[in-house]
Amino acid sequence: MFRVERTVEFESWLDGLRDRRAKEKIATRLVRVESGLLGDWKAVGDGVSEMRIDHGPGYRLYYTIRGQVIVIQLCGSDKSGQGRAITLAKELAKSI
């Protein structure tokens, strides 16, 4: 079981999504994460991992785990902004 915490950067990105179906898929994914089901993910380095959402342009949710129970949503992107988002996620992870 995890508790999901979100950064301001993640909330801002999510609020800016116009694709309602994508928002629904992301919300569903985060509920599953709280149940311990991370699904499709991979490590991207420096303690940061990426959850992949197979919808539209390929959404990515970046997170780090602190302790045994907290998953912190750092930021999100689609496939086209992946490089910038990974860099931002790593910077945010260091500041937490």
Question: Can you describe what each PLM-predicted range is?
Answer:
Residues 43-44, 65:
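Generic beta-strand structural signal
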Residues 45-50:
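Short, hydrophobic/aromatic-rich segments at coil-to-beta transitions
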